[in-house]
């Protein structure tokens, strides 16, 4: 979702004859993710509210971020994406004529977890996947869906769940994707 908006912007700037009729995102961190925010030090381990799996994800991602290209881990942070000078603001107008379907996963829940980070799909919260605080100037035509699913089969495997618990492997989720494409 994040990179596709940049590609759509370039197509528009180049006056390409190629027209994007719709955009569908699955678990895209429109407003960042707890993983990114933890990696750059904007939140501490308490954001996991004692959830052992999320604590492991946070610490492992932080350790692996050192091997990523410079800035890659920062691109999925609230600090980078939000606010008047954030990446989302730079994308204002790009999606004006494009219907956007936003799909979030709520497989993981926690009592007392901050709404910014909970529920989530193992990496991205429903709030971020639904772009709840992204201004209408950036995202004017949105439809949202939530499924009690993980981000991917990688996350499902990590928690010992069947692959069909992943958004990327669930036929109900994929039906929504197909409908969004067909309706564009």
Report residues per predicted region:
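Hydrolases whose catalytic domains are alpha/beta-hydrolase-1, hotdog thioesterase
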Residues: 2-7
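Helical cap/lid subdomain of alpha/beta-hydrolase-fold lipid enzymes
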Residues: 9-184
